[in-house]
Amino acid sequence: MPVADVYVHYVNKVERKDRTEAELIKVITWLTGFDSKTLKSHLKKQTNFKEFFKAAKIHPNAKQITGSICGVKIIEIEDPLMKKIRYMDKLVDELAKGRPMEKILRSGL
């Protein structure tokens, strides 16, 4: 599945909660290590999740992302690709719920 197919839903979700696409991009680039140009290139090329995360340099503080997403505890996810996808889902949820950006980006933890 292309990341772009899900990205549209991420944008809709955060904008419904009065957050911006720019904030969404900041969250995703923090997690993946991509700059916004590279992220947009992956979206335009319809890169699938496997290739998207294969190219990413996951932020070292991503391990601090905890909790549940879709009823599944992140710490219990064994598949590395699925864990990265759920990290991104969790960050988007936190953004949509109005959590401060410095907490979403695990600054000062």
Predicted regions, residues:
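A charge-rich, low-complexity, intrinsically flexible signal that marks solvent-exposed coils, linkers
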Residues: 1-109
